[in-house]
């Protein structure tokens, strides 16, 4: 999915507003994912998946850091996320549908923390961005 110049502006502006909360929001989005879609827990059998878990928060920070990298490379997502795509496709073998589930929970988390900024245009831009990231992360599955 191609991001328009307006989408790129919206994504960058939103990520700037998130600032130092990206890791926190990543952890919260993972908690939402595990609660809403329990089958996603199967990829983390060694984690304490209880609310507020340090392991979930740490992995949420990894997710947020990867998204921050993607935001910094909106014109070359495949290049920026190539190693992560290899990891998820070849080593972790994450079912691609899980990226959509996490993307949804990321949108909910961001909307709950920034309701005034979460306009329909921003929502659409972030949805397209998360979809583009998901597409890149699943590109090596073929």
Curated annotation (Swiss-Prot):
Modified residues (Phosphoserine): 4, 36, 50, 103, 125, 139
Modified residues (Phosphotyrosine): 25
Tissue and organ distribution: Red blood cells.
Binding site for O2: 59
Superkingdom in the source lineage: Eukaryota
Gene3D superfamilies in the record: Globins
One MF annotation (Gene Ontology) recorded for this entry: organic acid binding
Positions contributing to heme b binding: 88
Phosphothreonine modifications at: 9, 109, 135, 138
Keyword match Acyltransferase: no
Keyword field: Acetylation, Heme, Iron, Metal-binding, Oxygen transport, Phosphoprotein, Transport
Residue positions, PTM N6-succinyllysine: 8, 12, 17, 41
Domain Globin: from-to ranges: 2-142
GO cellular component, as recorded: blood microparticle; haptoglobin-hemoglobin complex; hemoglobin complex
Modified positions (N6-acetyllysine) in chain numbering: 17
Subunit structure and binding partners: Heterotetramer of two alpha chains and two beta chains.
Protein family membership: Belongs to the globin family.
Protein name stated in the entry: Hemoglobin subunit alpha
Origin species: Ailuropoda melanoleuca (Giant panda)
């Amino acid at each position: 999915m191609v991001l328009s110049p307006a989408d790129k502006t919206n994504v960058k502006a939103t990520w700037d507003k998130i600032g130092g909360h990206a890791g926190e929001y990543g952890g919260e989005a993972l908690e939402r994912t595990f609660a809403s879609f329990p089958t996603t827990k199967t990829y983390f059998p060694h984690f304490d998946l209880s609310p507020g878990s340090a392991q979930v928060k740490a992995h949420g920070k990894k997710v947020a850091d990867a998204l921050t990298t993607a935001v910094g490379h909106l014109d070359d997502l495949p290049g920026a996320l190539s190693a992560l795509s290899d990891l998820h496709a070849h080593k972790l073998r994450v079912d691609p549908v899980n990226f959509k589930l996490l993307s949804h929970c990321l949108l909910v988390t961001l909307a709950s923390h920034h309701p005034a900024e979460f306009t329909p245009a921003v929502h659409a831009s972030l949805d397209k961005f998360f979809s583009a990231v998901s597409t890149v992360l699943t590109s090596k599955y073929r």
